[in-house]
Amino acid sequence: MTCEKERFIWLNGDIVKVSKAKINVLAPTAQFGANVFEGIRCYWNEAKQQLYAFRLKEHYQRLYNSAKLFRMKCPYSMEELECFMKETVKANGYREDIAVRQTLFVDGFGSWFSTEPVGMFIAPI
């Protein structure tokens, strides 16, 4: 029998267990796919015992550009996003190459045209 370790994600300002993360099923993100995301590769350096994110600033700029096209406002600075990603990766204790999905989504109740409130999750996968 395989016993998987509980994973953590960052959701709207809090690091939570994946099994406890909740998004409203009637939110525009669930009803209409109202979200934008970036997948960021991180590479483990065994000699330095460190994970390194690949082209982080470029990924964040694309995330901002995607949100702008969708008329969503990212409520966080690039520096905050980097800090949140580091916190989330550390909470999981990864010592291997990983990908980190960072997703901005339209939360709450709304229609196809809703652009707020904007929620976010960061999920190492």
Question: Where is each model-derived feature located?
Answer:
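Conserved alpha/beta cores of soluble small-molecule-handling proteins
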Residues: 1-125
